[in-house]
Design a protein with these regions (language model features):
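Surface-exposed loop and membrane-interface regions of Gram-negative outer-membrane beta-barrel proteins
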Residues: 72-88, 98-143, 148-149, 154, ...
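Signature for the C-terminal beta-barrel architecture of outer-membrane proteins
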Residues: 150-152, 172-320, 351-353, 358, ...
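Short, solvent-exposed loop/turn elements at domain surfaces
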Residues: 71-76, 318, 336, 351
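Transmembrane beta-strand segments of Gram-negative outer membrane beta-barrel proteins
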Residues: 53-75, 100-106, 194
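Outer-membrane beta-barrel biogenesis signature
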Residues: 43-63, 102, 344-347, 356, ...
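Flexible internal linker/loop segments at domain or repeat junctions
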Residues: 322-346
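Cleavable N-terminal export/targeting peptides
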Residues: 1-55
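Conserved, mostly hydrophobic/aromatic
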Residues: 65, 156, 355
Length: 430
């Protein structure tokens, strides 16, 4: 059941009115119409100004429309059936122009399937591998954005939020039904180059939809993200307090950390680097008692159209709980086969190497790009071998249509089961 949301905004409607009465008593009858007119004219002008503002806001209203068609095939050892999912999504809405420095955005999603040989998480087809794209028709975003304060953006309502690289907070845009947040967000840049981003969240609208028992998470969560440029990159500090009432508070936690990401010219190319560290512990309604660490070290080197990179990412383990990132865009990390959506208690160490090649234009296709990533997984505690994964992708644009081909092959060892996935996706947006 969705929470009822009430939103309010303040406008600025002011006018200077001057009224000077200096007349002898015997002229009152003559002056009275002048007095009435002096009051009426500013009121009429103010009304005309307000009407003009509304007309401008409506004239500046922009439509929102995008569509996606995707086939996903999954072979997973241990299940009697292979999954074949052909799903589509329509997303439509509008964003008004500003009136009293405030804009309204309304957006709906409709997700359905054309081939339904898969476990959508709510259709009961448990003999198939999971493809987490259940049928749904939902209000995706409903927000008011106000910019009346200097260097400040205030967003109220159901909104999309992605912080940094979405490792801790993201919209899970890969899935057909994205993750959104009901709350209030304030972004401020009045303190020089320091950017302050604070959000209060009352409800998390997850990718599983209204019909799922885990489709909505309620609670009081707070996200604080501070960033500042330095000569060697952007330095970010963050504190995320997630308090989720659902599931016995298992996903409630507090995470505090820092991140540095930058690029430097080296020779004929560019060296990119990212380092991050965070510590996490139980918080709020959590019934657990744990503490776990996270760290990331990644380097890339780009020369013209070629980028090579490698890194190590560790989500630490604890006797009670591994380091969790329940609000992240999880598909982006630890392999596209999605075998580590929940971190085991022994944690996950991911050592990876990647290569990308920007091919450019090929025939009718533009922006052709190729990507390959190899992962080696192991436990942070105990050193168990979690297996390996090879991910391949190709993407391009044909006019206004984006085309994506992806393949993931996970080879299990002491964790999970062998799994391979294939996707072909078409995107269109106005």
């Amino acid at each position: 059941t969705k929470k009822k949301m009430v939103y309010a905004f303040q406008g600025d409607a002011s006018s200077d009115r001057g009224l000077i009465m200096s007349a002898k008593p015997n002229f009152r009858a003559l002056i009275a119409p002048v007095v009435l007119l002096s009051v009426a004219l500013p009121c009429a002008a103010e009304a005309d100004q307000t009407t003009s503002r509304w007309e401008t806001a409506l004239a500046d209203t922009k439509p929102i429309f995008n569509a996606r068609l995707r086939y996903e095939g999954v072979e997973q050892e241990g299940l009697p059936e292979d999954a074949s999912a052909l799903t589509y999504r329509f997303r439509a809405g509008f964003e008004t122009g500003k009136i009293f420095d405030t804009a309204l955005l309304v957006e709906f999603d409709h997700i359905d399937d054309l081939i339904d040989d898969f476990n959508s998480t709510i259709n009961g087809k448990t003999g198939y591998p999971v493809v987490a794209d259940p049928n749904a028709t939902e209000l995706n975003r409903f927000q008011l954005t106000n910019t009346s304060l200097p260097d400040t953006i205030i967003t109220l309502g159901r909104q999309r939020i992605g912080l940094d690289d979405a490792r801790f907070v993201g919209n899970v845009g890969w899935r057909q039904n994205e993750q959104t947040f009901d709350g209030a967000r304030v972004q401020n840049s009045s303190l020089g180059e320091l950017k302050v981003d604070f959000t209060y969240i009352a409800q998390i609208n997850r990718i599983f939809g209204d019909d799922s028992a885990v489709g909505r998470w309620d609670g009081d969560s707070y996200l604080l993200n501070l960033s500042h440029p330095t000569p060697i990159g952007t330095l970010t500090g963050f504190a995320y307090q997630i308090d989720v009432d659902n599931a016995g508070g298992v996903f409630s936690s507090q995470t505090v950390g820092a991140r540095l990401a930058g690029k430097q010219a080296i020779g004929t190319g560019k060296l990119g680097y990212t380092v991050s560290y965070a510590t996490q512990s139980d918080y709020g309604s959590s019934s657990l008692d744990y503490s776990a660490d996270y760290y990331l070290v990644e380097g890339t080197y780009s020369v013209e159209a070629v980028t090579l990179g490698a890194g190590i990412e560790v989500l630490g383990g604890d006797d009670a709980r591994g380091f969790q990132t329940p609000l992240a865009t999880l598909h982006k990390f630890q392999g596209w086969a999605d075998k580590f959506l929940t971190t085991p208690t022994t944690g996950v160490e991911d050592i990876y190497a990647k290569a990308a090649y920007q091919v450019g234009d090929v025939g009718p296709f533009s922006g052709v790009a190729l990507t390959a990533v190899y992962h080696d997984f192991s436990a942070d505690v105990g050193g168990a071998d979690y297996g390996s994964e090879l991910d391949l992708a190709a993407s391009a644009k044909w006019d206004k249509i984006g085309i994506t081909l992806k393949y993931a092959d996970y080879s299990a060892d002491d964790f999970a089961t062998n799994t391979s996935k294939f996707w072909i996706q078409f995107d269109f947006a106005l």
